[in-house]
Every structure is written in structure tokens, then in C-alpha cells.
Amino acid sequence: MKFVDEASILVVAGDGGNGCVSFRREKYIPKGGPDGGDGGDGGDVWMEADENLNTLIDYRFEKSFRAERGQNGASRDCTGKRGKDVTIKVPVGTRVIDQGTGETMGDMTKHGQRLLVAKGGWHGLGNTRFKSSVNRTPRQKTNGTPGDKRELLLELMLLADVGMLGMPNAGKSTFIRAVSAAKPKVADYPFTTLVPSLGVVRMDNEKSFVVADIPGLIEGAAEGAGLGIRFLKHLERCRVLLHLIDIDPIDGTDPVENARIIISELEKYSQDLAAKPRWLVFNKIDLLDKVEAEEKAKAIAEALGWEDKYYLISAASGLGVKDLCWDVMTFIIENPVVQAEEAKQPEKVEFMWDDYHRQQLEEIAEEDDEDWDEDDEEGVEFIYKR
């Protein structure tokens, strides 16, 4: 299946149903009074995270989602039916952005999580609501309010503990194949990896972590060179980044300059991402003898001003890989994810005596005069007292 990590959609909540103007007409009850019912609330539009999905490709073709309108009120104090909600299922890891405001509405980070993205309109009031001691035959009603309408940008961001950084052909995919059951394509030409992939690294029966491989970066990626930086967003939720450096590039490029390019492109994309913990990992040390590899790695680290620990591995032969993975596992255990508090979603209600309806009644009351019935030509026929 084609991997699609961005999609734009339109969501429209249902309008509220209008209130009804009606009077009770029944045999032997000549002055039945008002019995117009309220309208129904409009349906809402929800997002729901589904772990069985792994791409947004469906929303490249289906771009509009509309909830049902609330039914109008009816006579005999019948309230209109509430409009049906629409639920849009997205992969776990999807970020929802309002394109109109640029606001991030929410991150769908766990299976079954729901997010309200468009609220249905409020119902209108029937004329029964406007009955009072001075207005026995009200002919007022209110219409339902429009539902929310939004253009949303959906961004799928892979949920991984560890992210891989590096130039094309640095050995990122080979590393993923060596430590997990994932089988990304590996070849001796740049940009073999065209889409992100995930691998689960199992250290033992109880300990494991997820590593993400993204296409390599080149100079000018922030301006769109190569595959650009569109895949860097998949590293935003990672707890640690492994910066793979080809210690002996086959194309004769300078490893120090290659590393600086990656750091520069990372900073151009996001200062927050650049500030994440980043480990230096020298790959392909099997191409050199042990002493030469150690000396070259030390020289590169000094040229980069790197003072922390660095690792020497060979993803192809497995040399040094296990020790690196155990250190990563220890780091992940010692630095658990801080879960953001999930926003409480409003509950569905069939009727809510809210500020909107209260304001509508007050506006009608202000327009009434002290002698309401004299302004109503047919009012005498409907006035009654107990």
C-alpha cells in the first residue's frame, strides 16, 4: 500500500434544527395553547485513532465529511431528532491541524482516542418556550445555529522511541534490518529508502523499543533538495536520535562535513528537534582495521566539537550493535514518556439550557410591550385562564 503521511479534508458539522410554531388543536379543547417543539441538535464530527490503519491514503480521494442536520421541531411538543455524528478513523500518530488558524487541535497518540473537530449547531426553540403570563399565544420561535466548518490538515507522525538520522547510504536501513524484523530495501545507491519505516527491537521478553528509519538528508533539504525535510516530522516524538555517520564514505566525501550538513538541516527544520538527545554513531567500521577506525572516529568527533560518548559499529556484520541497543534501552527506561493530559471531550446531550437559548428568550422579552395581546389580532381566541 502506498504510504501517504499528509492529507487535507473538509469537515462540516450538522446545523441545528429549527423550532416549530404550533398550537394545540383538539376536539373539546378550544384553547389548547402553544405546542411547538424544539429542533434537534446538529451532528458532530469526530476523529478516532485506529491502530489497524497505517496511512492516510483514503483521504486523498474522500475529502469531505458532513454530519447530519438536526430535524426541525414538530407539533404536540415533539422535539426534532438529533443529527447523526460522523466519525473519521485515522492511524495512531496523526496530528490534526486547523488550516484556518494554524492551531493544532490534537494528537491522536493511542488506539481508540477520540477528538471533536466540528461541533454541531444548537437546536432552535419552539413557541412553547416563549409562553408566559402575558403572552398566551406566542408566535415566536428560533432557528438552529449553523454547525462548525473547518478545513483540516492531517499529518501522520510515526510513533517511535528512536529515530535514525544520516546522509543517504549511511547505513540506516541496514541497521534497522540488523536489529529488528523490519526489512527495508537496502542497495548501494542514494535514496534507496523513499518512505519512513518502523522496526521493533526486542532485547528480551520484557524489554523492547521502536526505531524509525527515514529517507536520508542532503544539503539544501530545508529548501526541498533531495526528498526535502518532510519526513523529519516523524522524528518529533522520538526520545533519542541516532546520528549515523559513514566513517569511510565510498564517494570520497568528508564525514565531518556530512555530519555538519545533517545538524544544519535539523536546526533549520526545528529548534525543538535539534535540541533532542542525539547520539553519534560511526558505521561501517568493518571497512577499516580497528586502530584506524578508532583514530578516524576520534578525529571526526573532535572536529565536530563532540564531547559526549560515541559508538563504533558495523550494521552489516553486527559489530558493536548489541551494546548500542542495550544502552538505548537503558536510556529509554530511565527517560519515560511524559504523557500530555488529554483534553476532556464534551458529552452528548439531548437538550442543554445554554447561554444561546437564554439570550434568545431575553431578546424576545425585550421586544414585548406590557399589553402583548392587543397587538395580536387573533390573540383573543387563544387567551385562556385557569
From Swiss-Prot:
The record's Gene Ontology biological-process terms are:
ribosome biogenesis
UniProt keyword terms in alphabetical order? Cytoplasm, GTP-binding, Hydrolase, Magnesium, Metal-binding, Nucleotide-binding
Q: What function does this protein fulfil?
A: An essential GTPase which binds GTP, GDP and possibly (p)ppGpp with moderate affinity, with high nucleotide exchange rates and a fairly low GTP hydrolysis rate. Plays a role in control of the cell cycle, stress response, ribosome biogenesis and in those bacteria that undergo differentiation, in morphogenesis control.
Q: What is this protein called?
A: GTPase Obg
Q: Which family does it belong to?
A: Belongs to the TRAFAC class OBG-HflX-like GTPase superfamily. OBG GTPase family.
**What is a GO molecular function of this protein?**
GTPase activity
Q: Name one GO cellular component term.
A: cytoplasm
Q: Where does GTP bind?
A: 166-173, 191-195, 213-216, 283-286, 314-316
- Is Phosphoprotein among the key words of this record? no
